[in-house]
UniProtKB/Swiss-Prot annotation:
Full protein name: Oleate activated transcription factor 3
InterPro entries in UniProt: OAF3, Zn2-C6_fun-type_DNA-bd_sf, Zn2Cys6_DnaBD
DNA-binding region per UniProt: 21-48
Keywords: Cytoplasm, DNA-binding, Metal-binding, Mitochondrion, Nucleus, Repressor, Transcription, Transcription regulation, Zinc
Pfam families named among the record's database cross-references: Zn_clus
GO molecular function, one term: zinc ion binding
Subcellular location as annotated: Cytoplasm; Nucleus; Mitochondrion
Gene: OAF3
Family annotation (PROSITE patterns): ZN2_CY6_FUNGAL_1 (PS00463), ZN2_CY6_FUNGAL_2 (PS50048)
Any one cellular-component term (Gene Ontology): mitochondrion
């Protein structure tokens, strides 16, 4: 039987228009057919294309974004010793990837420097009688470490107890009673400044509605003086008036006692309120203003580790979620008022996460016109924070280079330039520790920072109380890692970087002496500069550690428990493991430094290192603390900075036996 090969019947294809967008069709997801963009594409930041919009093959017009070719990834270990959770009696805290402690932990040069500083500092405190309590000064609980020489914990704060009197005076008075500000002065002086300078940086209020609320508040206080009706949020409005007044005082009268009085009243009221249970839109706005205020003030700001307001930020982000102020505002709710609140909340969440190297409170993002860089910031944090031991260096730097804040407020644009520069400095420093090369990138990042510092001190952006804070933070980050650069460098580059560090220290302590966390770093940084300024500073420190704290060297793999090594052998082993051979490039940018008279940094602790090493080398069991402090404070000019006479300070004989 013969079978004929029949040609197949052609199948007629139906050409019907695709109703869903081509992106959803490709992803096989449900599409709501929204125009001009469906909700799925809006969330993902993609551009919708429908087949009915074009005669050509529309699938070719679906837009994709590709990362530039970065070549092979370069992974670095930014946390070779891990990240630590530290505790003391009053608090516990996690040190983020970009914290001062994390910077020091990943650099062997910084670890030995800090270890030697600790030895010298403890040598000075051996003669302190810890059974004798200090009854002279009355510092607040948050500053207990400075109140006595005799505390059981050893702290750097013991050595300059007396000069903290200014900080004691700020808070030693009892908390004042609430009061209503003078209305005419509020409207004529404080409120215009808030509208002109502060509100553009924290635009969470409708100014017309805000003015109406405050006018009604003052009128009710005239009708019923001394009574706060919380049914119409009078306590919240009173708190807002205190913050508005503080913004003006911080800029033009920063030593006014009213600033701290207002802070104490607000703290007391916050504890007594039910804000942890429920909130309103007005209260949430005031919290964001309080978050902004705490950044500006040197009284109760973010503290030494920039984490003092984490609880406040958690409260803000939590109540944003409870009120529906999240990313869904761009898909389901059309409220510009709520969007402004969410944008400002995200600004603080992202900024502090990048500065500390921590996770954000909200880990989602969308590509919306109001926040064009948010997805890049989160991508950078994911690259660095998810696994600090496996950071894609090239990708991290590439993302930082892509950040563009030119369309933002000029202050926000400038601030993020500083944040990006200081973050690059730390990423490049992490690479330097990982592969023991790349110091030119560290120097280039430092030059970018110096340029921004010079701009600030020539023509600071107002409000200065706000712009100064990021300068203080970035200067401290540079000061933390500069000793590692100096110890790696050789003459003449070493001397030039030492001169740079001296200029930064001089500017840092003379421009920001009233931040408590700055003030208490003074003694340590003075010792550090004098120590690394020695010609044989590295050998000198290794010798001290070999005799006094060999555990530090053992953790670095330098010494052995089974065999004693000579001082020269320790130095040879160090050079074999950590010696830096790359040539250090010269700085191309000059740090501008004013001629400060008096100079707080140069005039303090003149003989501190000499006296400490003298006592340490003598291996005395105890030291004369009175004599030591007389040497330390011999030529200080704190009376001009803190409005007090050093001669009137409590005598050591009245504190120590």
């Amino acid at each position: 039987m013969v079978y004929e090969m029949l040609s197949p019947v052609p199948v007629k294809k139906r050409h019907r228009p695709t109703l869903v967008c081509l992106n959803c069709r490709r992803r096989k997801t449900k599409c709501d057919r929204g125009k001009p963009s469906c909700s799925n594409c809006l969330k993902l930041g993609e551009t919708c294309v429908y087949s009915e919009d074009t005669d050509e093959n529309a699938s070719k017009k679906v837009r994709y974004e590709y990362m530039d070719d970065l070549g092979l990834p370069e992974f670095i270990n930014m946390a070779p010793k891990g990240l630590h959770l530290l505790s003391k009696r009053s608090a516990s805290w996690f040190n983020g990837l970009f914290s001062d402690i994390a910077i020091c932990d990943r650099d062997p040069y910084l670890r030995i420097t800090n270890a030697v500083i600790d030895i010298l500092r403890k040598s000075a405190s051996k003669g302190i009688d810890r059974s004798e309590r200090d009854t002279v000064l009355q510092l607040p609980n948050s500053l207990k470490t400075v109140t006595m020489y005799n505390r059981s914990e050893k702290s750097e704060d013991q050595l300059y107890h007396q000069i903290a009197r200014e900080f004691s005076a700020l808070r030693s008075a009892p908390i004042p009673e609430t009061y209503v500000p003078y209305e005419y002065e509020f409207w004529s002086k404080y409120y215009p400044y808030f509208v002109d300078k502060i509100h553009p940086l924290v635009p969470v209020f409708n100014l017309i509605e805000l003015k109406d609320l405050l006018e009604k508040f003052f009128q009710r206080q005239k009708d019923h003086p001394g009574k706060l009706n919380d049914k119409v949020h009078e306590s919240t409005l009173l708190m807002l008036t205190y913050l508005i007044i503080n913004f003006f005082l911080l800029e033009f009268d920063s030593h006014n006692r009213l600033i701290q009085d207002h802070i104490n009243i607000i703290k007391k009221w916050l504890v007594q309120s039910k804000w942890f249970q429920k909130t309103t839109l007005l209260q949430l706005r005031v919290w964001l203003v309080l978050r902004f205020h705490n950044w500006c003030t040197y009284h109760d700001n973010d503290g030494n580790r920039m984490n003092a307001n984490d609880g406040l930020m958690g409260l803000i982000m939590g109540h944003c979620a409870s009120l529906g102020i999240t990313w869904q505002l761009w898909t389901n709710v059309d409220s510009d008022e709520c969007k402004n609140i969410w944008i400002n909340a995200l600004h603080w969440d992202r900024k502090l996460a990048v500065l500390n190297g921590n996770d954000t409170f909200n880990g989602r993002t969308m590509r919306v016109p109001e926040l064009p860089n948010d997805h890049l910031v989160l991508k950078f944090l994911k690259c660095c924070v998810d696994d600090p031991t496996h950071v894609n260096y090239k990708l991290a730097i590439e993302i930082l280079n892509k950040l563009n804040f030119e369309e933002q407020n000029p202050m926000v644009t400038w601030e993020w330039k500083v944040i990006v520069a200081v973050t690059k400095l730390q990423i490049n420093h992490g690479r330097l520790n990982h592969i023991n090369e790349g110091i030119s990138a560290v120097i280039a990042s430092l030059e970018d920072l110096i340029t921004l510092w010079n701009e600030h001190f020539i023509r600071p952006l107002a409000p200065v109380s706000y712009s100064s804070r990021i300068i203080e933070i970035s200067m401290n980050k540079a000061l933390v890692l500069l000793p590692a650069i100096i110890l790696r460098a050789r003459n003449p580059c070493k001397q030039k970087i030492l001169q740079l560090m001296d200029k930064i220290l001089t500017t840092y302590f003379n421009e920001f002496p009233y931040y408590y966390h700055v003030f208490k770093r003074l003694f340590k940084y003075k010792l550090t500069l004098n120590l690394i300024n020695r010609e044989d500073s590295l050998d000198h420190m290794l010798t001290i550690l070999k005799h006094e704290n060999h555990q530090v060297l053992e953790k670095l793999g330098i010494t052995s428990k089974d065999a004693e090594m000579s001082d020269d052998d320790v130095i040879k082993v160090w050079n074999a493991r950590f010696s830096f051979t790359e040539k250090v490039v010269n700085l191309k940018v000059e740090m501008m430094c004013k001629n400060y008279e008096p100079n707080l940094f140069s005039s303090s602790y003149q003989h501190a290192l000499e006296k400490l090493e003298e006592r340490h080398s003598a291996k005395a069991d105890a030291i004369d603390v009175t004599q030591f402090l007389q040497q330390v404070f011999d030529s200080t000019d704190f009376d001009l900075f803190y409005g007090m006479d050093v001669g009137e300070l409590p005598k050591m004989d009245s504190i120590l036996p």
